[in-house]
Amino acid sequence: MKTIICLFTIAIAAMAAVTNLSNVLKNGNDNFTARMFTEVVKNNPGKSIVLSAFSVLPPLAQLALASDGETHEELLKAIGFPDDDAIRTEFASKSRDLRSIKGVELKMANKVYVHDGGKLDENFAVVSRDVFNSDVQNIDFSKNTVAAKSINDWVEENTNNRIKDLVNPDSLSSATAAVLVNAIYFKGAWSSKFDERLTSDRDFYVSKDKTIKVPMMYKRGDYKYGESAVLNAQLIEIPYKGDQSSLIVVLPKDKDGITQLQEALKDPKTLETAQQSMYSTEVDLYLPKFKIETETNLKDVLSNMNVNKIFNNDAQITRLLKGESLSVSEAIQKAFIEINEEGAEAAAANAFTMTRSSKVYVRPPIVFNANKPFYYALQVDGVIMFNGIFIN
């Protein structure tokens, strides 16, 4: 049996909004994000991470439309969609919304690489073009080094050179039928930038009893702020230009509270409920500058999320290529994020391989000092585009 490889890339920096995402897509993304976050954290103990569950959804949705039977039902359940019509409607709308974003650099690109001699199923070709705005290219996978370079060059171009070497040539062979690639890149700026002159090295608690020095940014400003007893944490929302996207930071009250926080975040409604009680107030904000890169083996992660059948030899992916039944042999995500005084920049890439984002106050400002491990999420119009934890 021929195989498919799925690759995911995401690049994001201080973003503006995707509008009118329906509850179906938002709820599906919230649940998928919470589950994927839990698994990626589990696989990276004691490490800072960045991931984008949002970028995994389009390839999985494409595979759902290309599959039958139990594989089809398993994929629909995983991404939280009731049927194929909902996939077509929601992702077509999302693609249009992304292309209409003004004032920031925001790109979302999809591409399907098909083995020489292979041809997309006519219906899948139409859906790929009209729903996912996906390009198609035939390629000789037996020339694995040349094929990998071609795919990696496309990924670099669509993530502003932030994601490199996504595909290992050794993962490609004459048995490779197709490679599904998704890339997202975003770049923007804070609504109100941090002053670089106020950035200084300050203590950061990597554990309850151990500190290191990190470059800590500082700004006094008007932010949405809240506290949650359920999360045992402070929350702050830092807006990007356009005020439709923001960075949410959830800071445990205890120096060693990150594990408890991660456990609470398994329920996506917990964070949503905490955000609903946030209010505007003056805050003294201390936030580390940081840069994180994470590579995730999505085959392991998805399997732990009960997405298994696409990896089996009897995967029933029969509507992607004409006359060929396929399975997924490899699924990889590379992700990148950088937070600094100007804003944020992040990148991620995914690949699936198949075989045949002044007021006067009577009280002093609230202090939000992110000097211990914390959770962050970049939201666009209330939808989590990528998230992670910063530990050191």
From Swiss-Prot:
GO cellular component: extracellular space
SMART domains named among the record's database cross-references: SERPIN
UniProt superkingdom: Eukaryota
Keywords: Protease inhibitor, Secreted, Serine protease inhibitor, Signal
Compartment list: Secreted
GO molecular function list: serine-type endopeptidase inhibitor activity
Site (Reactive bond): K359, V360
Pfam families listed in its UniProt record: Serpin
Tissue specificity remark: Hemolymph.
Residues in the signal sequence: 1-16
Domain notes: The reactive center loop (RCL) extends out from the body of the protein and directs binding to the target protease. The protease cleaves the serpin at the reactive site within the RCL, establishing a covalent linkage between the serpin reactive site and the active site of the protease. The resulting inactive serpin-protease complex is highly stable.
Primary role: May play a role in the prophenoloxidase activating system in the silkworm hemolymph.
Protein name: Antitrypsin
Species the sequence originates in: Bombyx mori
